[in-house]
UniProtKB/Swiss-Prot annotation:
GO terms for cellular component: plasma membrane. Residues 34-43, 102-121, 203-234, 291-332 are cytoplasmic. InterPro entries: Adeno_A2B_rcpt (IPR001435), Adenosn_rcpt (IPR001634), GPCR_Rhodpsn (IPR000276), GPCR_Rhodpsn_7TM (IPR017452). The chain crosses the membrane at residues 9-33, 44-67, 79-101, 122-144, 178-202, 235-258, 267-290. The gene is ADORA2B. Belongs to the G-protein coupled receptor 1 family. Its main location: membrane. This is Adenosine receptor A2b. It comes from Bos taurus (Bovine). Disulfide bonds join C78-C170. PANTHER family: ADENOSINE RECEPTOR A2B, OLFACTORY RECEPTOR AND ADENOSINE RECEPTOR. GO terms for biological process: adenylate cyclase-activating G protein-coupled receptor signaling pathway; vasodilation. Keywords: Cell membrane, Disulfide bond, G-protein coupled receptor, Glycoprotein, Lipoprotein, Membrane, Palmitate, Receptor, Transducer, Transmembrane, Transmembrane helix.
Amino acid sequence: MPLEAQDAVYVALELALAALSVTGNVLVCAAVGTSSALQTPTNYFLVSLAAADVAVGLFAIPFAVTISLGFCTDFHSCLFLACFVLVLTQSSIFSLLAVAVDRYLAVRVPLRYKSLVTGARARGVIAALWVLAFGIGLTPFLGWNDRKIATNCTEPGDAATNVSCCLIRCLFENVVPMSYMVYFNFFGCVLPPLLIMLVIYVKIFLVACRQLQRTELMDHSRTVLQREIHAAKSLALIVGIFALCWLPVHTINCASLFQPTWAKVKPKWAINTAILLSHANSAVNPIVYAYRNRDFRYTFHKIISRYILCRTHILKSGEGQVGSQPTLQLGL
């Protein structure tokens, strides 16, 4: 496939993912905002995740497309474009980790859960996690970057005359060192939370199964536990999808760092596919919610019917007065 055609396909797929990410995750935020049944601390963390995914669609994907074309710009502008997606990725990981801890507390200490995990505390944790995500994602601005070796777009003489005016080719690997991406970002900030989440969900299932085996458990308590297990399965599925979507791009980064010769000849289609897969993760979560959660499914249908499809039937109320009422038909 010619390079131009390959780039065109990549850009088209990225734009499609951006549209799906924004649409689906705005729907998630709207669902939690309009449904009292969905306004729980757990779902506040999912809204944080959805907000990160909306930002991926609105900003990170356009930035990624821009960077993939290798246009010329000043170093720090390019570095910001490259780092912004790292902020959103880190925020997503922290949101998933917070959800895992939240679900563990719900199963481990059900009687104290409501007093421990309140809406105010959840919002405070979310704010702290976003601040931490920005700190981690923007670390290259503190000096861990490739400014000194970045390939520039100007003539060598021009760069030597006025370094501040030197434009560089805006490519991710031209501004962010692989040592940062592998040692700090992947080994330090991505892999540990994923492993912690794996341990937490294993513990959730073990604790819940032990409690379900207790013969003296009341029917109501058994129903609550079964519901918690179902929720944990859904959230574990989201974590699994996140890992599957993001591990390929991190694997390529590791190969680029540890096998420098391969880094010079790695196929562009492999890089683009890995990047597309990582961005596809932002479009998948709303589908999981709709498939696995009855309340989300109901609220999605309600919002789409009322505000998008405008399904209303006319009601005559009194003389000459016309009213409208939304109609919902849910097959749940």
